[in-house]
Amino acid sequence: MADSVAVKLCKYAKKCYLCHPFSKIRLMREINPKETTRAYAFEMWMQAPMPMVTFFKTLDVSRLVKFSRRNGLKFNMLMCYCIGRAASKIKEFYLLPVGDKLMQYESIAVNTIVANSAGEVSSCDLPYCEDLAQFNNDYMRLTNQVAQSCTDHDLSQESMVIGTSALAQYEIDGAVGMYSGVFNNPFMIWGKYKRSWFKTTLTVSFQFHHTQMDGAHASRFLDGLQREIDSLKL
């Protein structure tokens, strides 16, 4: 399954297949839960009144802060990229319960909230691309487009979207209980990073639907996120 849903890379210009302007849109498709490793979880958690689980983790983002400043790149963009990269290596991120069905995707997107020209906020889905330069180009183009048009950019019909919210001006540890009964997507939230003498840390909360993944998968993702931050390079 992991091979069939892995993000494919374009052979030209080192761009990801799904980021290439001439790539074919791949939509989500329904799959039989009984034919997946999530069969038991689907049966146990789909009708649960509160199927969401929240984990907290304190990340060392010292390298990310330095990388951002040295290369003139936005910290939030780099966080979104590392989140997408870590998630793309875990097959459970290509599944999502939607309504009463289990859907499978071939790509991942990372959502970010954008302050728009009307003084409100809009939602912007960013297609994950392994190429950091391409992801940055998409980030700058799409967030600017959304900010000016005040129109959400939605990829939920073609990609499994990881929601994020960065409250970078505020000192918070995370959030729990964000379940509307409509959206089951995994969601991350963080506030201001904290500086000390030796490192800079950022506490994040990660909420996920128990049908989609178990605690071990979520923990592996968060550990993977730290590794992606530590190994980030152009």
How would you name each of these model-derived features?
Residues 64-89, 202-221:
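Acyl activation and transfer enzymes in specialized metabolism, enriched
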Residues 116-172:
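Helical lid/core segments from catalytic subdomains that handle acyl or acyl-like groups
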Residues 157-171, 186-223:
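Histidine-centered acyl-transfer/condensation active-site motif
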Residues 31, 46-78, 94-110, 162-164, ...:
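Gly/Ser/Thr-rich phosphate-binding loops and adjoining beta-strand/alpha-helix segments
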